[in-house]
């Protein structure tokens, strides 16, 4: 038995983190892959819970050892998804979510073509800006950069298998969960799980 790998991408402010957090509360089979990073630990963060915190040298060593499904440099910090961590979770029949951008999604799909990908969109640019401002943590320059980055990110929505519009949170959560539930009923997945029963049902007497 093995779980499925899911890629979930969205522009900053679309509500991806909140949706994924509620989804994992709702369905115990779904887990989020913990990324590795070289950025400094923030107050309240725990190593191995929020991120795996690595030195730059240790991160580059893992790149050299081909231990990342995808990795990228964001400003002055490196981020990556550990191949071994993801594989161990999938082997436990967990559905694993990678919260990565469109570039990371492209890298992962090359390695794991049957990964299921979902893109989350805000209902409008006006609403996206409102959500970014509502955080109250970013300067005007940062908000402008995030809005510009968001437009570039959203141009890649059609590279994904599914699209969820986060207009009403509960509706978007239900739609996102339905993707996971439907994928578990895929013929190949069901046969893997119930092969003995199905073979018995389809034997000629």
From Swiss-Prot:
SMART domains per the UniProt record, alphabetical: GuKc (SM00072)
Ligand binding (ATP): 10-17
Principal subcellular localisation of the protein: cytoplasm
Keyword check for Kinase: yes
EC numbers: 2.7.4.8
Domain Guanylate kinase-like: 3-181
Catalytic activity: GMP + ATP = GDP + ADP
Compartment list: Cytoplasm
Coiled coil: none
Enzyme type, top EC level: transferase
Keyword line: ATP-binding, Cytoplasm, Kinase, Nucleotide-binding, Transferase
PANTHER family: GUANYLATE KINASE, GUANYLATE KINASE-RELATED
NCBIfam families to which the protein is assigned, alphabetical: guanyl_kin (TIGR03263)
Family note: Belongs to the guanylate kinase family.
Name assigned to this protein: Guanylate kinase
Organism: Hydrogenovibrio crunogenus (strain DSM 25203 / XCL-2) (Thiomicrospira crunogena)
């Amino acid at each position: 038995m093995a779980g499925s790998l899911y890629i979930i991408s969205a522009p900053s402010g679309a509500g991806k983190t909140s949706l994924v957090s509620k989804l994992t509360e709702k369905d115990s089979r779904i887990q989020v892959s913990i990324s590795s990073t070289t950025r400094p630990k923030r107050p309240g963060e725990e190593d191995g819970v929020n991120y795996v915190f690595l030195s730059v040298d240790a991160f580059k060593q893992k790149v050299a050892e081909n231990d990342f499904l995808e990795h990228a440099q964001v400003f002055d910090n490196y981020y990556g998804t550990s191949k071994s961590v993801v594989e161990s979770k999938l082997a436990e029949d967990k559905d694993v979510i990678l919260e990565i951008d469109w570039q990371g999604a492209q890298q992962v799909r090359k390695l794991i073509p049957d990964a299921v990908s979902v893109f989350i969109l805000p209902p409008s640019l006006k609403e996206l800006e409102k959500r970014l401002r509502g955080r109250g943590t970013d300067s005007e320059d940062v908000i402008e950069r995030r809005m510009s980055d968001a437009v570039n990110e959203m141009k890649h929505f059609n590279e994904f298998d599914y699209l969820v519009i986060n207009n009403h949170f509960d509706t978007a959560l239900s739609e996102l969960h339905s993707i996971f539930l439907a994928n578990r009923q895929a013929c190949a997945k069901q046969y893997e799980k119930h092969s003995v029963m199905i073979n018995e049902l389809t034997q000629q007497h």
